[in-house]
Structure formats: structure tokens, C-alpha cells
Amino acid sequence: RQKDGNSKQFGFDGGIGNLSSRLTLEGPIIKDKWSFLLAGRRTYYDILGKAAGLDELEDNTMYFYDLNGKSNLVINNNNRIYLSGYMGEDVFELGESMYMRWGNATATARWNHIFGDKIFMNISAIFSNYDYKLGVPGDNADNFDWSSRIKDYNGKADFTWFANPQNTVKFGVNTIRHEFRPGKITTNGDNSMFSDMELAHYNAIESALYLSNEQKLSDLFSMQYGVRLSHFQQVGKGEVNIYADPENPDKNEIIETISYGKNDKIGDAFVHLEPRFSMKYTLDRNSSVKGSYNRMVQNLHLISNTQSPTPLDIWLPSSTYIKPLKVDQVSIGYFRNFQQNMYETSVEVYYKDMHNVLDYIEGAELFLNDAIETELLHGSGTSKGLEALVKKSKGKLTGWVGYTWSKTEREIPGINNGNPYPSSYDRTHDLSLVSSYQLNDRWNFAANFVYATGNPTSYPVAK
């Protein structure tokens, strides 16, 4: 959460580092009533490298920047307005050989209203935009410019009701319009080996209602429980291919293509009930047991390119041929503190059961493919693991050690003869160590160590 601007006096804060600099400005617009905060930072490894005469950076550019803004207006004791915005971009340019740029921009307007001592409300309007660009400049045969984008328009209302000292109820509603522009390629001149092309656009409306309660049953036992009702509908303008075998779409077996007008409903809506439950039981003043169950539904899918060496990832909505990912997760953990909370320890185990998991056919072509559903396979998956943590938060030496053992598998017809196989996200072992030593008021030493199992890999067994 970004801090609020100072409503009493103007001020600034900044820092100049070896690789980046930052600057923050804040102050009142109307004293004690309306404030602002502006912050920005930029790396300059490329500038310093060129100034130092590093040949490998002579024609190359690499940096990122981000800008943040926030403004708070106190209308009265019961009403406040919050405005915030963010913009950031990563840039990598390899001379005249290639370039990559990707960035995010968001803007939020929020109204906070207090109805009384027991209930308050937040109504928010949120805009977000993610864009990715990749290309080869110039007018040679390999020149091209690729771009993709996702825009979201989100409206939501959230309520919190302090019903009594034992119960805190939260409920609300939200609606998001997703606009996907999976890819567009343009060229410079007639020499390029590529042709100008734009993949089909996708739009969808995602809505949800939720209700939850945090209940304290006794000094030792508390729990949270609730439910979320989600609704997802793909809408036009767009086209849908009809295949001879809808369960196994083949781009060589398209019977017809149906066109839909702007905001027309495309296919059936996906409606899901998502229950959540968690509990905490305090064994004594230093230890407790926690457990939870969650059902989650993901309607947006990340399609990662399997052939291009660049991160040409594509986001797509659930649709006629791509069903929502459904996950059921259970977990239980033991937590204990030692020596007056100087040391915190925990051990947790979890299990996930996943349905409608996506993977790709052998040699899948995802780049500039307008029938991408023909490259996908559907199945199920599981994930299980153990997480252990030891944390020291007091004294001159602080830090933590974390270890995770996990196993993530998929079972998809058409891959590995239908037998389970490790997911690309599988990491059997993950060990992290973070430490900090405060020598005095001026000197602090820090050290980090990370070990992780590599990606699952299949090797050829013969030439």
C-alpha cells in the first residue's frame, strides 16, 4: 500500500544509487484536507556503462522506470476520495538487432464512506493496461514490429460490517471488462519476410458477488468462511470457428466460422460457486494450528510460446474451446514462537487438485496463430508440498530460512501416453536464506542465498 501525501507541509525525499535514483514529492493542496504525493525512479545502467566506455553497451539500451501518484481529499468525517495512478516500463534495445519493451499503467478512483460505527463502504473505479512490444528495427528482410495489449475496466463496491465483537462481515460486487489484443505485427517497407497481420480481438465481462464472515468463537478458536459467485462471459465483436470434432479441434477441419457483433454474447457463460474456509486454533500463548480450504476459478489463461526464444506470452479468456481453470486447495500448518517472539517457526503442508489445465501439442505453433485452440490440450493436475520457515526478528542479527518441498504434476491425454508428468512449474526443492547484521547505526551487512531445483526437462533418447 502506497503511503498518503503529507497534508500539512511540503516535502521531498530522494536517493542516488549506483544503478538507480528515486525522488518523492508530497504536500498539501488544501492544508489538512487535500494532499498529493508524486514519486518516480529510473535505473541508468545503460548510461553509466556507455560513459565508462563498455563496448558491449555502446549501441545498447537497458533500463526501467516507474512513476506513482496519489491524491487524498477529506470531504468530511464520513467521506474521503482517493485518486492514484502508476506507470512503468522496462526497455531493452540491442542496437539495431532487436528491441523489447513492456509496461503497465493503472489508474484508480476510490470513494470511502462511513455509514456509522459499524459499517463502511469503498466504491472503486479501476483502469489497467499491460502492453508488450518486440521487434527488429530497420528495413532489412527480418524487420518487424510486434505488439500485444490487455486492458481492464473494473468497477467494484466493497462493504465491511462490524456486526458485533465476535463477527466481522464483508460483502461486495465487482464487474470487469477485459479487452485482449493478443498480437499485431507490422513491417517497414516491402523487404520484410513477414506480412502485416493482426490476431483476432477478444473481449469478456467478468462479474462476481462475495460474502464472508470472520468469526471469533472463543479466545482460542476463530474462523473465516465465505463464498464467491463468479460469472464470466465472452462477448463480441469476434469470430468463432466451428470444427468437425469440437472436443479435438483441428485447423484443417473447420466447418464454418460464425461472426458476432459488438457486445454480442459468444458461447455459454461460465458460472461458478467458490467457497472458502479457514480456521485458527491457539494451543497456548506461543503456538497455534491453522487450516484452510479454498476453491478458486481462473478465467484468464497465459499461453507461453514454446518456439520463440523471446517471451512472447499471450493472454486469452475462457471461451468455447478453453474452459476455466478450477482449483481446490487444502492446507494445514503448525506455528510456534520462541523466546518472547524472537524466533518464529512454521511448518505447513498443502494439496491442490486442478481441472481444465492447459498444455500444448507437440511442435505447437503459438506465434501469429488465429486458431490457437487447435494447439492446446486439456487435462488435470495436482500439486502438493511442504513449507518450513524459521525467522528471527529481534537482535543485531535478523533474517529467515525457508525451505519448500513440492511436486506438481499434470495428466493430459496426448502427452506421455496419458501418464502423469512433471509440470513446467515443478520445483522439487527451494531453499532461501536471508540475513542482515546491524553492526552499528551506520553499518549494516546483508547476505542472501537461494537454491532451487531446475526446470523439468525431457532429453532425446535417440538420434
Question: What residue spans do the PLM features occupy?
Answer:
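Outer membrane beta-barrel strand-and-loop segments of large Gram-negative receptors
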Residues: 152-156, 198, 206-208, 317-323, ...
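Repeated loop/turn-to-beta-strand initiation elements of outer-membrane beta-barrel proteins
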Residues: 33-36, 46, 78-81, 115-121, ...
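Extracellular loop and loop/strand-boundary signature of outer-membrane beta-barrel proteins
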Residues: 9-11, 53-57, 92-98, 106-110, ...
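Transmembrane beta-strands of outer-membrane beta-barrel pores
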Residues: 2-4, 16-20, 29-31, 40-46, ...
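Transmembrane beta-barrel wall of Gram-negative outer-membrane proteins
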Residues: 17-44, 55-91, 99-123, 127, ...
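Surface-exposed extracellular loop regions of Gram-negative outer-membrane beta-barrel proteins
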Residues: 131-132, 179-191, 233, 238-256, ...
